[in-house]
Amino acid sequence: MTYDYKSKIYLAEAVLNVKDLARQTAFYTQIMGLGILSQTETEVVLGAGNKPLVHLIQTNHEQAVKSSYGLYHMAILLPSREDLADVFKHIAELDYPFVGAADHGYSEALYLEDLEGNGIELYRDKPVAEWDIREDGRIVGVTEELSAQEIYEMGRKVEPFVIAEETRMGHIHLSVKDSQLASAFYQEVLELADKFTIPSASWIASGDYHHHLAVNEWGGKNLAKREEDMPGLAYYIVEVEDKGDLIAIAERANNRGAEVKWLSSNALTFEDNDGILTRVRKNINN
């Protein structure tokens, strides 16, 4: 498998600990239009077509999602502007609230939260010819007003609504204590490059993409370190093309002093300074 934009990684899934599995499952199916791919009494895997995107795990912990570092938002990438318009119209006509919208120069994005406060971005990428790509490979992002009415009017009303089959996880944006420290950590461990940085946030990517990961410290310096079973991000999944990439990531994480756990011969997790877990696995098709 060859990844888009000459990337060496692929964002696969976000795995969330949730306090009310039934209500959250209803949100992701009825509001977001994802399908249930597998289900037990304590876990639900949801996706687009046959591709898992969001994995929900029941937790008995009661902390608020935003009381700890972890997920800022998971960014779900629609294959076209028309597909973004369809999901926009569907959610808007259900009167479910959006918390923001923006034209970022390289993408058009809508923002909302699930029922427990996990951030979600729905976006579509503009053609690469429209991106502000600098000579050094950096890709400048902006935050400008979205042509929301134009996009909404493109939307087709379909019942029952199902999100476009080619939808996938586009990037993961993390809430961290120190964005510069976190950015340097992920750049080294996952071999990502700085694409755009401000004092409080950083956007980093593999290859020529605008960002696969972002980190920001907008939540402040006093949030709790993530612990097992806390509501919110349990971990997110990154895929690599071969076993050699996996071994190299483990070595670089160890060199940074990160705790690395091998889950199998083809999968591992590592933990950053804020307790955020990244799971990396070899692509099963390779």
Annotate the PLM regions.
Residues 9, 16-22, 75-119, 176-180, ...:
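Vicinal oxygen chelate
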Residues 33-39, 98-99, 191-196, 255-263:
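Short secondary-structure junctions
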Residues 35-69, 119-126, 193-230, 270-273, ...:
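Conserved short beta-strand elements that form part of the metal-binding/catalytic scaffold
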Residues 2-61, 68-71, 76:
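An N-terminus-focused feature that recognizes amino-terminal "leader" regions
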Residues 43-57, 61-103, 110-126, 130-137:
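Active-site-adjacent scaffolding segments
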Residues 21-35, 90, 178-194:
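Amphipathic alpha-helical segments
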Residues 165-191, 195-199, 205:
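A mid-sequence, solvent-exposed acidic-amphipathic segment
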Residues 1-22, 129-180, 233-236, 286:
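N-terminal beta-strand motif that seeds the catalytic metal site of vicinal oxygen chelate
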